[in-house]
Swiss-Prot record:
Listed cofactors: heme
Stretches that traverse the bilayer: 3-23
One cellular component term from this protein's GO annotations in UniProt: membrane
Lineage, highest ranks first: Eukaryota, Viridiplantae, Streptophyta, Embryophyta, Tracheophyta
Gene: CYP73A2
The protein, known as: Trans-cinnamate 4-monooxygenase
Keywords annotated in UniProt: Heme, Iron, Membrane, Metal-binding, Monooxygenase, Oxidoreductase, Transmembrane, Transmembrane helix
Catalysed reactions listed for this entry: (E)-cinnamate + reduced [NADPH--hemoprotein reductase] + O2 = (E)-4-coumarate + oxidized [NADPH--hemoprotein reductase] + H2O + H(+)
Superkingdom assignment: Eukaryota
Amino acid sequence: MDLLLLEKALLGLFAAAVVAIAVSKLRGKRFKLPPGPLGFPVFGNWLQVGDDLNQRKLANLSKKFGDVYLLRMGQRNLVVVSSPEMAKEVLHTQGVEFGSRTRNVVFDIFTGKGQDMVFTVYSEHWRKMRRIMTVPFFTNKVVQQQRFNWEDEAARVVEDVKKDPQAATTGIVLRRRLQLLMYNNMYRIMFDRRFESVDDPLFNKLKALNGERSRLAQSFEYNYGDFIPILRPFLRGYLKLVKEVKERRLKLFKDYFVEERKKLTSTKSMTEENFKCAIDHVLDAQQKGEINEDNVLYIVENINVAAIETTLWSIEWGIAELVNHPDIQKKLRAEIDRVLGPDHQITEPDTHKLPYLQAVIKETLRLRMAIPLLVPHMNLNDAKLAGYDIPAESKILVNAWWLANNPAHWKDPQVFRPERFLEEESGVEANGNDFRYIPFGVGRRSCPGIILALPILGITIGRMVQNFELLPPPGQSKIDTSEKGGQFSLFILNHSTIVLKPRSSV
C-alpha cells in the first residue's frame, strides 16, 4: 500500500469525523429524521450492520425501528420502507419525489453516468428512454409476436434434455440449458438472432462478460469507497477492472450485434411496418436524432442485465420449489393434463387457462423474489415521509420481500403454498394491485419487463412439468435452496443437479 496515500486517507478520515460530528448535530436540530440505530462518526451504522443489507436483516431491524427507519452508511443516508402503506407512499403517492435512482461509483461506470433507462435519474432523459423502449419490448403486441419463439425455445429445451442420458438417471444442472433459453428468448426479441447450443463460442463469451459484470456490480467489496468517498482512491484497481469489463461488453454488443443488424438492414428500405426486431426501432430513434450511439448500447446493456438473469433466477427458483414439493408438482401436472390433454404442449394462451400454474408462479415470486428490495429509489430534493424529513439524495429501499413475507399480513408466509393465491389471496396479482405483493415494483419506476417475464415463466415451467417428473438426485430427498444475495438480488447459492424423467404419456 502506498504510505503517502494511506497517510492522506487517515488524515482525511480524521477531518471527516470532525465534520461529520458537527453536521450531525446541526442536522439533528434542523431535521426530524426517521428513527434508527445510533451510529459512529464517519462510519455511521456501517460497522454495526455490515455490507450485506439483505432483506431478512432489514426486516429484523424494522421490528425494532418501525416501518420507516434510517441507516447511516458512511456519508450516505439509507431509508428503509417496510410496510404496504409506506411502500404506496414512496412508489405511488409520491412517485415523482422518490422516482430517481441512486448513483454509486460502479453503476456510474456501467451505465455511463446514467445514459441508460433502468438506472438513470427521474428526468426527461428517462421519459425518452422509457418511451423508446416500450414499443419494441414491452407491449402485448410484442408478447403475441414473440410467444411462438418462447414456445419454440422451451420445446428445444425439452428435446435436448430427453437426448441427454444423464438427465433421467444421475441428473443434470438444468440451469445451464435454461440460461441458453433465456438468452435466446431475449436476443430473438432484440436482434432476431439465437445461439445454437450451450457450446456456442459467442454465447459463452457473452455469458462470461455478463457474469463478470454482474459479479462486480453486485459485490459488496466496493461499498467502503462508495460510503466514504475519502477512501475511494483504494478502489482504483477495482474500478479499473469495472471499466475494462464495461468497455469489452459494449464493444461486443456493438461489433457482433448492433453493427451486424445495421449491415443486414442497410440494403433494405426500413419502415416501421417491416421492422423485425427491437433494435430496428431503437436504431430508427437514433437515426432521427432522439438518442445517440451510446444510448443504443446501454439499452442493450439494460436488457442483458434486467431481463435475462432476473427471469432465469425465477425459473430456477420455481423448478427448485417443485422438486422439493412433489405433491405440488403432481397437482400442477394433473391440472395441465386435465385442461390440455395428452397431445397438446402448453402455449402462451394456454397459461391463462391454468389457474394453479399461475398460482405456482405467483408463489415463487412471493417467497423467492428475484429483486427483494426492488431497484433502489432516491429523492433528488428534501422530502417528507410519514412525518419525517428525508434529506435530498437519500437511498430509499422498499423491502418488497418483507411486504410479501410478513406474518402480520400473510398466513404461514414461510411455507411454499400456491393455494393461497386461489383461496384467501385470490384477488392478488403480480402487477401491484396490492402493496403487500409488488415483485415488479409499482408506479413510474416499476419493471416494465413484467409483460415478458410472466408468460415466459408460465411457458417454461409449464413445459418442464408437462414433459418430465422433476426429482432430486439419487440419495437425496431435497435439493439445496440456500439463498445468495447481491446489492439487491436474490438467487440460488448452488445450482443443483436435478433428475428429469420423461413422462411416457407425453
